[in-house]
Amino acid sequence: MLSLTVYTEINTLLFPQVVTTNADSDTLFYRPKRSGTGATIPGIRSKLFGLLDLSLEYRSVKGSYVPQFFDQSYDLNRVISASQGNETSIKTKDMAIFEGYDNDWTSSGVYGSASMNLFDLVKFNASYASMTADTIEYNSFNAVINVNTDNIPKLSVANAFYRRNNDKDPFDFDNPSENTIMGYRVGYEMSKGVSLIWEYSEFYRDNGSGELEPVKQTKVET
């Protein structure tokens, strides 16, 4: 069986101006005021045989806006440091993405996603977006696999993910960027309603010499 849904969405991002000075009124940090809007006109979503979900969108952006700005890796790349010679600069995520652009900047492109539920055992989801502004192209790729743990004793959650958003080539796996993050989460059920979660993630940051190196992070939480 096939179901079809047509929809539209409009979203905005607002970034207030931030200025930090020292006692001599020298500017230490400056972030300009920015804003932007993104619209999906139209979007089409379909479901095939109750197993495969597909969606396709045409996206239009004006100003300082990118889809999935607040993704699940936001806490890791909300502030980015970059080194050049003996100087290190600190930028927020919006400063790094929108540097060199103003609120009259426009872009457009397509977004597609597919997810499949395999007999309620494993669910896989992947999405890809390609946006173009003048001659500049930035793309995003996300993939997540979730295991249904309902029938696995003591296992409360099990998933793995790969994300690379707003990048020139998100499939260049040999050359990751600061927008790349991958990892997994595994949960052990200690008692009903209480789980011990082990989360591993790997992302990339400037090592102080202008080169990227992997940062491996492990968290344990309940």
Predicted segments, located by residue:
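Outer-membrane beta-barrel translocator domains and adjoining extracellular loop/strand segments
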Residues: 17-32, 67-73, 135-142, 169-177, ...
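Residues on the lipid-exposed face of transmembrane beta-strands in outer-membrane beta-barrel proteins
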Residues: 1, 42-47, 56, 112-116, ...
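Residues that define the transmembrane beta-barrel architecture of outer-membrane proteins
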Residues: 35-40, 50, 104-110, 137-143, ...
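C-terminal structural cap/anchor segments
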Residues: 84-169
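Long, internal scaffold/assembly segments composed of regular secondary structure
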Residues: 1-97, 105-106
